[in-house]
UniProtKB/Swiss-Prot annotation:
<feature type="modified residue" description="Phosphotyrosine; by autocatalysis">
    <location>
        <position position="928"/>
    </location>
</feature>
<dbReference type="GO" id="GO:0098978">
    <property type="term" value="C:glutamatergic synapse"/>
</dbReference>
<feature type="short sequence motif" description="PDZ-binding">
    <location>
        <begin position="982"/>
        <end position="984"/>
    </location>
</feature>
<dbReference type="GO" id="GO:0021631">
    <property type="term" value="P:optic nerve morphogenesis"/>
</dbReference>
<dbReference type="Pfam" id="PF01404">
    <property type="entry name" value="Ephrin_lbd"/>
</dbReference>
<dbReference type="GO" id="GO:0005829">
    <property type="term" value="C:cytosol"/>
</dbReference>
<feature type="signal peptide">
    <location>
        <begin position="1"/>
        <end position="17"/>
    </location>
</feature>
<dbReference type="InterPro" id="IPR034231">
    <property type="entry name" value="EphB1_rcpt_lig-bd"/>
</dbReference>
<dbReference type="GO" id="GO:0044877">
    <property type="term" value="F:protein-containing complex binding"/>
</dbReference>
<dbReference type="InterPro" id="IPR042819">
    <property type="entry name" value="EphB1_SAM"/>
</dbReference>
<comment type="similarity">
    <text>Belongs to the protein kinase superfamily. Tyr protein kinase family. Ephrin receptor subfamily.</text>
</comment>
<dbReference type="GO" id="GO:0031290">
    <property type="term" value="P:retinal ganglion cell axon guidance"/>
</dbReference>
<dbReference type="GO" id="GO:0021952">
    <property type="term" value="P:central nervous system projection neuron axonogenesis"/>
</dbReference>
<dbReference type="InterPro" id="IPR001245">
    <property type="entry name" value="Ser-Thr/Tyr_kinase_cat_dom"/>
</dbReference>
<dbReference type="InterPro" id="IPR003961">
    <property type="entry name" value="FN3_dom"/>
</dbReference>
<dbReference type="GO" id="GO:1902723">
    <property type="term" value="P:negative regulation of skeletal muscle satellite cell proliferation"/>
</dbReference>
<dbReference type="GO" id="GO:0045121">
    <property type="term" value="C:membrane raft"/>
</dbReference>
Length: 984
């Protein structure tokens, strides 16, 4: 209250408190004691002012004597910090013309001077009388003078003049008045300075502020917000001008939340039951419905029990509650699909943002236990956040009981500690058509036909009667498609055009009808050139067959000769170093044998024999896509005469190469040119007759397999991953049958095209591993560099590379694929990897890896290389898995193979993490950081309470990412329960 009174006083006295007096002769009750010189000049007398008050004055009237120079000096005046001083003089002057017999030296003016000093330097005995030390302020002239008549009638014509001077810097000053022939009285002298008064403006207090040294000066005064007020935007300030007046303020203060303005000078606390949420609000408001403020100065009203306010609700909005459950559910079952419809909740909680979630549970026949539905179930328009009271659910299992919970939620459901209200409905699906075929593989192709195979649907839902194949040229559309049927999961499509790309789909049929067509996949028939090339490759087989007939006849003759002799002798057969083909004895066509290009005396001959020379004019280079050992790798186009233009990858040989580097570079083309398989990267040709030298291969849109998997973590099904592995194994089977050992089989050396077909590549590196000194993947061993993490132990120890060592590497590739590109053996050093393998430790199964696949990995990692499966056996095993997807349902665990010690990648110590950011970084899910924080999961304690529905709600939709995060949350929860202090 006292402060309020003070503020009111400051406002009321603002105008009156603008001048501070330093000296005023009107208040003197004794002699002023000023110094006059000469003594006959100025004289101090007592008199009366116009109001007949007694005053002390000085007068002088020596007008009858010429050459007057009368000085009057005040006492020392302390300036009290003022920079500019004002002097108010009240005086009377006799009109010279009213004086008889006055000489011409009579004056009606006088001069005002000042002298600035730090101390008293002039007294009556030691005064200085010269204009030199003084600074003249002005010559003072009377506006009115009086005559004898006025004097006789006692009419006092008093003049008042104000003069200012400055700036002053010393402690004080003297005033001096000079008379040089006037008849006058100095009635009073008031010396003062101006200042801007204390004031309250815009809820801020500004202190008294002296004016500046000049009349035009502006002095800044910083304001202080009154109690319970805060500055808004810029700091608040006022300018004090030379007249002691405040200028327009800059900035302002306003009452802070919980306080309202009172009389524009105070901020009063909001009473109980009211609130003020922001500085900008004018006054306190009553609490909205279902909320209260039990104490004063509340910035917000808290919700009553059972009511909540959403994060995005403003404070002035009423608190609301959660909705009741949906009503009157209707279900319509159609084979393995269902339509659910319902009525909105009877109580919406006072909100208009009610949405619905569908929780799907698949149950046993007796419904005693249920589990969440898998990710294959489809919801239209969606599973979570439905705005309409209707949903279509498909891809359910046939003849299976289901329970569906329909939850009603609104903007405050997440604030409630209780689960959302819901209504449940139990249904059982009927017989249904089979699910889709997951993938197709090309077995072979001719100019006029393509042979395909595929696994049966994951959910056959009965006995498969047959398959229907739909196909059409890619350049056309499905309205121009043709149909074919097959009783098995293999079909040969005839009557096709050479060199054309065909789009193919397949679907299965049961007694319930056809299932949906599979996804579209592209396959290509052979061109005329491809056919001729294949024919050339089979000529040795034809010649060999003819030779075999001759040999047979000769053999009969030889047998008769041998039988007629008592002894026979044998001699060693000589074989040509350049034997390229032989009949395998397994039927047509015969298998080619790989020829090492370095067995040629002239390696260029190998290039000419195995690689087709391409004119550089047929090649268009477009953009850099990488860098190889010998130069840059480009994406480009190849347009050969009579063929359509295709995308290609172009490896170039950098300038300044040596002849050895050129041979080494082209050796990869000599190797690649010998291979022809859908899962081996295809060589289009080489450019050697111009610069730069180029190796041209087919273009693989998705790049290296390891980085492709990391970019698509969790986005592929197990069947799709097994299909990729099957393609890699088929390519390696082909290489092993050609007696070619890859030596560097790894996911980084597998390329993926747009149809997810995986192809083995990088054939130049296997011979030159010892030349790579920069890549930490490769470690020195026996004078060379080998990729330790992918290499069989016998190859590390003795550099014994065989197809069996490639099988070991293939097992590592399997682990890379099933872990979506994780680094084998994680952050273990290469030496630690070698030691662990020598002690018979093997990699554990990746997360959610089927047990059958991990067992195949362990088979590939047998210490005895003769115990490892051959690539042909691996292909057969994977084909069985694809044909029987149920075999992939069992997930492997570390304890599943007690006879085989497995490396255990230790679970991170989650108790060491302090923030959600640290935890997400540790599990490599940092891309969801903003989603967690925005949704309010800002602490690890909150994270441990998350469910799969929470992950869906914040945007984690990939199944693999959900499983990875939920697994980590479970481990964190276990660790925190073991360390209760962490939960504090």
């Amino acid at each position: 209250m006292a402060l309020d009174c003070l503020l009111l006083f400051l406002l009321a006295s603002a105008v009156a408190a603008m001048e501070e007096t330093l000296m005023d002769t009107r208040t003197a009750t004794a002699e002023l004691g000023w110094t006059a010189n000469p003594a006959s000049g100025w004289e101090e007398v007592s008199g009366y002012d116009e109001n007949l008050n007694t005053i002390r004055t000085y007068q002088v009237c020596n007008v009858f004597e010429p050459n007057q120079n009368n000085w009057l000096l005040t006492t020392f005046i302390n300036r009290r910090g003022a920079h500019r001083i004002y002097t108010e003089m009240r005086f009377t002057v006799r009109d010279c013309s009213s004086l008889p017999n006055v000489p011409g030296s009579c004056k009606e003016t006088f001069n005002l001077y000042y002298y600035e000093t730090d101390s008293v330097i002039a007294t009556k005995k030691s005064a200085f009388w010269s204009e030199a030390p003084y600074l003249k302020v002005d010559t003072i002239a009377a506006d009115e003078s009086f005559s004898q008549v006025d004097f006789g009638g006692r009419l006092m014509k008093v003049n008042t003049e104000v003069r200012s001077f400055g700036p002053l810097t010393r402690n004080g000053f003297y005033l001096a008045f000079q008379d040089y022939g006037a008849c006058m009285s100095l009635l009073s002298v008031r010396v003062f300075f101006k200042k801007c008064p204390s004031i309250v403006q815009n809820f801020a207090v500004f202190p008294e502020t002296m004016t500046g040294a000049e009349s035009t000066s502006l002095v800044i005064a910083r304001g202080t917000c009154i109690p319970n007020a805060e500055e808004v935007d810029v700091p608040i300030k006022l300018y004090c001008n030379g007249d002691g007046e405040w200028m327009v303020p800059i900035g302002r203060c306003t009452c802070k939340p919980g306080y309202e303005p009172e009389n524009s000078v105070a901020c009063k606390a909001c009473p109980a039951g009211t609130f003020k949420a922001s500085q900008e609000a004018e006054g306190c408001s009553h609490c909205p419905s279902n909320s209260r403020s039990p104490s004063e100065a509340s910035p917000i009203c808290t919700c009553r029990t059972g009511y909540y306010r959403a994060d995005f609700d403003p404070p002035e909005v009423a608190c609301t509650s959660v909705p009741s459950g949906p009503r009157n559910v209707i279900s319509i079952v159609n084979e393995t699909s269902i339509i659910l419809e319902w009525h909105p909740p009877r109580e919406t909680g006072g909100r208009d943002d009610v949405t619905y979630n569908i929780i799907c549970k698949k149950c046993r026949a007796d419904r005693r236990s249920c589990s969440r539905c898998d990710d294959n179930v489809e919801f239209v328009p969606r599973q979570l956040g439905l705005t309409e009271c209707r949903v279509s659910i498909s891809s359910l299992w046939a003849h299976t009981p289901y329970t569906f919970d329909i939850q009603a939620i609104n903007g405050v459901s997440s604030k409630s500690p209780f689960p959302p209200q819901h209504v449940s409905v139990n249904i059982t699906t009927n017989q249904a058509a089979p699910s889709t075929v997951p993938i197709m593989h090309q077995v072979s192709a001719t100019m006029r036909s393509i042979t395909l195979s595929w696994p049966q649907p994951e959910q056959p839902n009965g006995i498969i009667l047959d398959y229907e194949i739909r196909y059409y040229e890619k350049e056309h559309n499905e309205f121009n498609s043709s149909m074919a049927r097959s009783q098995t999961n293999t079909a040969r499509i005839d009557g096709l055009r050479p060199g054309m790309v065909y789009v193919v789909q397949v679907r299965a049929r049961t007694v319930a009808g056809y299932g949906k067509f599979s996804g579209k996949m592209c396959f290509q028939t052979l061109t005329d050139d491809d056919y001729k090339s294949e024919l050339r490759e089979q000529l040795p087989l034809i010649a060999g067959s003819a030779a075999a007939g001759v040999v047979f006849v000769v053999s009969l003759v030889a047998i008769s000769i041998v039988c007629s002799r008592k002894r026979a002798y044998s001699k060693e057969a000589a074989y040509s170093d350049k034997l390229q083909h032989y009949s395998t004895g397994r039927g047509s066509p015969g298998m080619k044998i790989y020829i090492d290009p370095f067995t040629y005396e002239d390696p260029n001959e190998a290039v000419r024999e195995f690689a087709k020379e391409i004119d550089v004019s047929f090649v268009k280079i477009e953009e850099v896509i990488g860098a190889g050992e010998f130069g840059e790798v480009y994406k480009g186009r190849l347009k050969l005469p009579g063929k359509r233009e295709i995308y290609v990858a172009i490896k170039t040989l950098k300038a300044g190469y040596s002849e050895k580097q050129r041979r080494d570079f082209l050796s990869e083309a000599s190797i690649m040119g010998q291979f022809d398989h859908p899962n081996i990267i295809r060589l289009e040709g080489v450019v050697t007759k111009s610069r730069p030298v180029m190796i041209i291969t087919e273009f693989m849109e998705n790049g290296a397999l390891d980085s492709f998997l990391r970019q698509n973590d969790g986005q592929f099904t197990v069947i799709q991953l097994v299909g990729m592995l099957r393609g890699i194994a088929a390519g390696m089977k082909y290489l092993s049958e050609m007696n070619y050992v890859h030596r560097d089989l790894a996911a980084r050396n597998i390329l993926v095209n747009s149809n997810l077909v995986c192809k083995v590549s990088d054939f130049g590196l296997s011979r030159y591993l010892q030349d790579d000194t920069s890549d930490p993947t490769y470690t020195s061993s026996l004078g060379g560099k080998i990729p330790v993490r992918w290499t069989a132990p016998e190859a590390i120890a003795y550099r014994k590379f065989t197809s069996a060592s490639d099988v070991w590497s293939y097992g590592i590739v399997m682990w890379e694929v099933m872990s979506f590109g994780e680094r084998p053996y994680w952050d273990m050093s290469n030496q630690d990897v070698i030691n662990a393998i020598e002690q018979d430790y093997r990699l554990p199964p990746p997360m959610d890896c089927p047990a059958a696949l991990h067992q195949l990995m362990l088979d590939c990692w047998q210490k005895d290389r003769n115990s490892r499966p051959r690539f042909a056996e691996i292909v057969n095993t994977l084909d069985k898995m694809i044909r029987n997807p149920a075999s992939l349902k069992t997930v492997a665990t570390i304890t599943a193979v007690p006879s085989q010690p497995l490396l255990d990648r230790s679970i991170p110590d989650f108790t060491a993490f302090t923030t959600v950011d640290d935890w997400l970084s540790a599990i490599k899910m940092v891309q969801y950081r903003d989603s967690f924080l925005t949704a309010g999961f800002t602490s690890l304690q909150l994270v441990t309470q998350m469910t799969s529905e929470d992950l869906l709600r914040i945007g984690v939709t990939l199944a693999g990412h959900q499983k990875k995060i939920l697994s980590s949350i479970h481990s964190m929860r276990v660790q925190m329960n073991q360390s209760p202090s962490v939960m504090a």
